[in-house]
UniProtKB/Swiss-Prot annotation:
<feature type="transmembrane region" description="Helical; Name=1">
    <location>
        <begin position="28"/>
        <end position="48"/>
    </location>
</feature>
<feature type="transmembrane region" description="Helical; Name=2">
    <location>
        <begin position="53"/>
        <end position="73"/>
    </location>
</feature>
<protein>
    <recommendedName>
        <fullName>Amino acid transporter AVT6C</fullName>
    </recommendedName>
</protein>
<feature type="transmembrane region" description="Helical; Name=7">
    <location>
        <begin position="260"/>
        <end position="280"/>
    </location>
</feature>
<feature type="transmembrane region" description="Helical; Name=4">
    <location>
        <begin position="148"/>
        <end position="168"/>
    </location>
</feature>
<feature type="transmembrane region" description="Helical; Name=11">
    <location>
        <begin position="408"/>
        <end position="428"/>
    </location>
</feature>
<comment type="similarity">
    <text>Belongs to the amino acid/polyamine transporter 2 family. Amino acid/auxin permease (AAAP) (TC 2.A.18.6) subfamily.</text>
</comment>
<feature type="transmembrane region" description="Helical; Name=6">
    <location>
        <begin position="219"/>
        <end position="239"/>
    </location>
</feature>
<feature type="transmembrane region" description="Helical; Name=5">
    <location>
        <begin position="181"/>
        <end position="201"/>
    </location>
</feature>
<dbReference type="Pfam" id="PF01490">
    <property type="entry name" value="Aa_trans"/>
</dbReference>
<keyword id="KW-1133">Transmembrane helix</keyword>
<feature type="transmembrane region" description="Helical; Name=9">
    <location>
        <begin position="354"/>
        <end position="374"/>
    </location>
</feature>
<keyword id="KW-0812">Transmembrane</keyword>
<keyword id="KW-0813">Transport</keyword>
<dbReference type="GO" id="GO:0006865">
    <property type="term" value="P:amino acid transport"/>
</dbReference>
<dbReference type="InterPro" id="IPR013057">
    <property type="entry name" value="AA_transpt_TM"/>
</dbReference>
<feature type="region of interest" description="Disordered">
    <location>
        <begin position="1"/>
        <end position="24"/>
    </location>
</feature>
C-alpha cells in the first residue's frame, strides 16, 4: 500500500499530474546511477592495487549485492509506515534520536562528497600544489599559468556558471537529462581507460597485476580492510532513494531501477579498477587522475589523457546537484520541521542553496588532502547509511513486516559492517600514528 505523503519535503502529488509522475524507468536508472558513481570510481584502481584483482572483484560484487538488499529493506519499511524520507523511517523505528542520527550522517556524507568533488575539479583544472608528484592542471597545460586559471578562480567560475544553475532545480526528476549526460561521461571515462589499457597490453607496456594481495607481514593483512570502506562509499546512494522514489506514481519502481543501476555501476567500477591497475600497476595513485596527468609521450596519448580527466570532471559537476538536493532537504527538515514545502518557499530555498554552496566552496579551497578523510568517511558515516541503519530498522521491525530470513541477513550485514569498520578505523589510526 502506498503511504500518504505527509512530509513537508515533497509537494502534494496528483495522480493526473504528468509533471510529477512523468519520470521514465530510464530516467530513474540514470538518476540512481549518477548518484552512485562519484568520487569512488577514482579510487577503484588503488583498491585493486591493495586487494588484488580477485578479492577486489568479490568485494565489489558482495557490497553491490548488499546495497540492493538494504535499499529493499528501506523501501519495505517505508511503505509499511507513513513516512516518505529516510529520516522519517528512522524516527518511526528509533524515535527522534534515530531521525537526527540519519540526518546528520547524510549531511556529513553528502557535504563531504561535495567537498571532495570540488577538490578534484580544482586539481584537474588548476593543478595540485600539496606536494607529492607534480600535478599540473589542464588550464595551465593549455594556456600557461595566469591569475584567472588559478584554483580559486577556476572553482569560482565552475560554481557560478555550472553548479549554481543546476542546484537551483527544485525537483530531482528535472535533473534526469543532466544525470543521463553524467552517466554517459562516466562510461566515456571507462571506455577511454579501457582503450589505453588494451593498447598498452597489445604493445606489451602493461604492468604485471597481482591476482591476490601480497601478505608478506601482518600489517599487509590489516591494510586490506582500508580498501573496503572506499568501495562501500562508492556504493552509498541510499539518501537519494526516497527523493527519487516518491516522485513516482509507484515508489516501488525505484527498487528494480536500483538493481539495474547497481549492476551497471559495479561493471563500471570493475572495468575502471582493472584497466587502471593494468596501466599503472604498483605506481597507481589513490587519485587515478594523477596518473593520467603523467606524460604519455605522444600527442594522441596526451589528448586522450586530457579527455579522461575532463570527462571525469564534467561527470562530477553533474553529480554534484543530486548530492546537494539530498543535503538541502535534510538540512531543511532538521532546521525547519514545521515549515511548508521547501520548493514552495523561494526565499528559504535560495538561502539554503547559496549558504551550502558558499560553505562547500570555502572548504574546497581550505582542505589540502582528501584521501584519509575519504577512508574515514567510508568506515564511519557511509557504512552507517548504507548498511548499519537499514539493518537496524529490519531488526527493530516496528511495523512487523520483516521476515525471519530478512532478520538473519540484516544481522549478518550489521555484524560485517561494524567489524570491518572497527578494523579499518584502527588500521588507519595506526598508520597515521606511524607516519
Amino acid at each position: 500500500m502506498t503511504p500518504q505523503i505527509k512530509t513537508h519535503l515533497l509537494p502534494k502529488q496528483e495522480p493526473s499530474s504528468s509533471e510529477n509522475h512523468g519520470s521514465s524507468t530510464s530516467g530513474i536508472v540514470f538518476n540512481v546511477s549518477t548518484s552512485i558513481i562519484g568520487a569512488g570510481i577514482m579510487s577503484m584502481p588503488a583498491a585493486f592495487k591493495v586487494l588484488g584483482i580477485v578479492p577486489a572483484f568479490l568485494i565489489i560484487t558482495i557490497i553491490a549485492w548488499l546495497s540492493t538488499i538494504s535499499v529493499g529493506f528501506l523501501m519495505k519499511s517505508t511503505l509499511a509506515g507513513e513516512s516518505t524520507t529516510y529520516a522519517g523511517v528512522m524516527k518511526e523505528s528509533f524515535g527522534k534520536t534515530g531521525s537526527i542520527a540519519v540526518q546528520i550522517a547524510t549531511m556529513v556524507a553528502t557535504f563531504g562528497c561535495m567537498i571532495i568533488f570540488s577538490i578534484i575539479i580544482g586539481d584537474v583544472l588548476s593543478g595540485n600544489e600539496n606536494g607529492g608528484p607534480e600535478h599540473i592542471g589542464v588550464l595551465q597545460e593549455w594556456f600557461g599559468s595566469y591569475w584567472w586559471n588559478t584554483r580559486i578562480f577556476a572553482l569560482l567560475f565552475v560554481y557560478g556558471f555550472v553548479l549554481l544553475p543546476l542546484v537551483l532545480r527544485r525537483r530531482v526528476e528535472r535533473l534526469a537529462i543532466s544525470s543521463a549526460v553524467s552517466f554517459l561521461l562516466a562510461v566515456l571515462f571507462v571506455v577511454i581507460s579501457s582503450v589505453l589499457a588494451i593498447s598498452a597490453l597489445v604493445n606489451g607496456q602493461t604492468k604485471n597485476p597481482r591476482l591476490f594481495p601480497e601478505l608478506s607481514n601482518g600489517g599487509s593483512f590489516w591494510q586490506l580492510f582500508t580498501a573496503s570502506p572506499v568501495i562501500v562509499t562508492a556504493f552509498t546512494f541510499h539518501f537519494n532513494v526516497h527523493p527519487i522514489g516518491f516522485e513516482l506514481k509507484d515508489p516501488l519502481q525505484v527498487i528494480p531501477a536500483t538493481k539495474i543501476s547497481v549492476i551497471l555501476c559495479a561493471a563500471i567500477y570493475f572495468a575502471t579498477g582493472l584497466f587502471g591497475y593494468l596501466l599503472f600497476g604498483d605506481a597507481t595513485m589513490s587519485d587515478i587522475l594523477v596518473n593520467f596527468d603523467q606524460s604519455s609521450g605522444s600527442s594522441i596519448g596526451s589528448l586522450l589523457n586530457d579527455i579522461v580527466r575532463l570527462s571525469y570532471v564534467l561527470h562530477l559537476m553533474l553529480v554534484f546537484p543530486l548530492l546537494n538536493f539530498s543535503l538541502r532537504a535534510n538540512l531543511d527538515e532538521l532546521l525547519y520541521p514545521k515549515k511548508p514545502s521547501l520548493e514552495k518557499d523561494t526565499k528559504r530555498f535560495i538561502g539554503l542553496t547559496l549558504a551550502l554552496l558558499i560553505c562547500c566552496f570555502l572548504s574546497a579551497i581550505a582542505v589540502p588532502d582528501i584521501w584519509y578523510f575519504f577512508q574515514f568517511m567510508g568506515s564511519t558515516i557511509t557504512v552507517s547509511i548504507a548498511f548499519i541503519f537499514p539493518a537496524a530498522i529490519v531488526l527493530r521491525n516496528i511495523h512487523g513486516v520483516s521476515t525471519s530470513r530478512e532478520k538473519i541477513v540484516a544481522a549478518i550485514m550489521l555484524v560485517l559492517a561494524v567489524a570491518t569498520s572497527i578494523i579499518a578505523i584502527s588500521t588507519n589510526l595506526y598508520s597515521l600514528a606511524a607516519n
